[in-house]
């Protein structure tokens, strides 16, 4: 058996490897310099006279931000005495101004979301009044429904904002099965949030290759990031080690490695899993069954036990996530009976842990990514399966972008982080006709780009603001309130109709 390989790599470009890997050739990843980097000449550090002087920080911001920073500069100019204060206090004054700007824009964003939500629900309220036909009882019902939704939504929104600010800062994250597919996408998303991540896989070569790829993604992010995002990315760190989650000794080594590298573990994600295709149980070999059960169920048990042993002795505790899948709710999974039984077992395991850890500082949760276009899902899939995948499947990067922000701010225990939220399900149903052929053509051939091509333009795609992103700006409770109002309006229409509806 190959010796376990340990690879360390951070955004600062430091790379060291365990003695087992010293004999192997490797290429040091090229690092991109930040925009703010100044090229200095060899003679005493003086800048070359032939190049024009770089713009000052204030000038660069005015060019990048446009009218907003021009307005700020005008206000500072009218203040007059502020320039002297800026010179007296130097960088402290500038940092104070930047901090005030950050707080202002954060508050303005939250207020803007609240106003938009109020306006949207107000439109529904007005439609309800029009449909009621002046009935005072109906108007009272609609009014109280709207008022209750506003109060509940305001409380939930305020709590979410407080949680986000209280839990700001880098997290220490361990992800098993994170050298490809969803696990790799989760690791990338945590790194882009400024977190420190430990990746793990059976193959030392896969660990090394994945770390190099993730480092390149971070450097690409640094090259295009603005100041605030750049400061966040500078905290990112990725390290990795080989680990077979089926072996208790490997899991213990992974825990010790994470403690040595990160100091503590805030989030542990049991993502390692396998499936051997779609076929009846009688066609599965002994080795297939043993590997599926060992990886999906036994591996999660071992990792959860070791993670909880560490977290319960930490001052801030920690959170463990087990991944849901087909069969988690106890429903039948024809042609994937072994895989489904392991996921159903994890659901019972989760319920038992919740009672065991009531007074513990460790939170145990589930994460449901839905159907993700990974090798695990596509192995042995038929043409009919692929046509269905066009409607409800998503790319790993898309799912990770939704799950990670929720995982980072989770609190308590027993939370279910789901990708298929009500807005997404509604959107999938409404756009079902458009989604035909999205990932596979009529003959079942893949038409989506490979991972390397998708990640090449990841920075641009992250900057886009889609309709789904707009829907996700609001909590599920907000959408429940809006849906409840629509049900009330439908009830008014049905109850106020004088006769039977057409077609009944």
Swiss-Prot record:
Enzyme Commission number: 1.1.1.294
Active site: 339 (proton acceptor)
Database matches in InterPro entries: Chl_b_Red, NAD(P)-bd_dom_sf, SDR_fam
Compartment list: Plastid, Chloroplast thylakoid membrane
Sites where the protein binds NAD(+): 175-199
Region described as Disordered: 41-63
Family annotation (Pfam families): adh_short (PF00106)
Catalytic activity: 7(1)-hydroxychlorophyllide a + NAD(+) = chlorophyllide b + NADH + H(+); 7(1)-hydroxychlorophyllide a + NADP(+) = chlorophyllide b + NADPH + H(+)
Record keywords, A-Z: Chlorophyll catabolism, Chloroplast, Membrane, NAD, Oxidoreductase, Plastid, Thylakoid, Transit peptide, Transmembrane, Transmembrane helix
Expressed in which tissues: Expressed in leaves and stems. Also detected in non-photosynthetic tissues such as roots.
Entry's family note: Belongs to the short-chain dehydrogenases/reductases (SDR) family.
Subunit structure: Interacts with NOL to form a complex that acts as a chlorophyll b reductase.
Function: Required for proper chloroplast degradation. Involved in chlorophyll b degradation.
Name this polypeptide is given: Probable chlorophyll(ide) b reductase NYC1, chloroplastic
Annotated organism of origin: Oryza sativa subsp. japonica (Rice)
Name of the gene this protein is made from: NYC1
């Amino acid at each position: 058996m190959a010796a376990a390989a340990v690879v360390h790599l951070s955004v600062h470009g430091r790379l060291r490897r365990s003695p087992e890997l010293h004999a192997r050739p490797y290429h040091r990843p090229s690092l991109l310099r930040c925009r703010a980097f100044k090229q200095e000449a060899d003679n005493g550090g003086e800048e070359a006279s032939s190049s024009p002087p770089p713009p000052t920080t204030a000038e660069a911001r005015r060019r990048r931000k446009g009218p907003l920073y021009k307005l700020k500069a005008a206000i500072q100019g009218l203040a007059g005495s502020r320039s002297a204060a800026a010179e007296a206090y130097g960088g402290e004054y500038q940092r104070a101004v930047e901090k005030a700007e950050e707080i202002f824009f954060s508050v303005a964003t939250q207020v803007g979301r609240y106003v938009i939500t109020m306006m949207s629900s107000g439109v529904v309220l007005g439609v309800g009044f029009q449909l009621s036909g002046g009935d005072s009882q109906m108007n009272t019902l609609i009014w109280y429904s709207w008022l209750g939704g506003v109060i509940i939504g305001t409380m939930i929104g305020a709590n979410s904002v407080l949680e986000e600010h209280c839990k700001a800062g880098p997290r220490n994250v361990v992800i098993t099965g994170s050298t490809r597919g969803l696990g790799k996408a989760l690791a990338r998303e945590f790194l882009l949030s400024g977190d420190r991540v430990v990746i793990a896989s059976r193959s030392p070569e896969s660990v090394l290759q994945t770390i190099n790829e993730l480092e390149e993604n971070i450097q690409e992010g640094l090259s295009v990031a603005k100041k605030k995002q750049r400061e966040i990315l500078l905290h990112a760190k990725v390290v990795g080690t080989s680990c077979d989650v089926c072996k208790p000794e490997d899991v213990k080594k992974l825990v010790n490695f994470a403690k040595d590298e990160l100091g503590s573990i805030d989030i542990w994600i049991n993502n390692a899993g396998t499936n051997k295709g779609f076929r009846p149980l009688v066609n599965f070999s002994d080795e297939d069954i043993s590997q599926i059960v060992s990886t999906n169920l036994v591996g999660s048990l071992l990792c959860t036990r070791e993670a909880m042993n560490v977290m319960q002795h930490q001052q801030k505790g920690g959170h463990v996530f087990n991944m849901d899948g087909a069969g988690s709710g106890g429903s039948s999974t024809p042609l994937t009976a072994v895989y489904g039984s392991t996921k159903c077992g994890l659901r019972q395991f989760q319920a038992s842990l919740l009672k065991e850890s009531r007074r513990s500082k460790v939170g145990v949760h589930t994460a449901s990514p839905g159907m993700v276009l990974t090798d695990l899902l596509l192995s042995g899939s038929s043409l009919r399966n692929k046509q269905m995948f066009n409607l409800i499947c998503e790319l790993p990067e898309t799912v990770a972008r939704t799950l990670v922000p929720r995982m980072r701010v989770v609190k308590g225990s027993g939370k279910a982080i789901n990708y298929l939220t009500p807005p997404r399900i509604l959107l999938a149903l409404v756009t079902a006709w458009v989604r035909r052929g999205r990932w596979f053509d009529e003959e079942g051939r893949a038409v989506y780009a490979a991972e390397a091509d998708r990640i090449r333009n990841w920075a641009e795609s992250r900057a886009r603001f889609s309709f789904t992103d707009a829907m996700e700006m609001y909590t599920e409770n907000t959408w429940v309130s809006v849906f409840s109002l629509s049900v009330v309006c439908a009830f008014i229409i049905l109850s106020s109709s004088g006769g039977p509806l057409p077609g009944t």
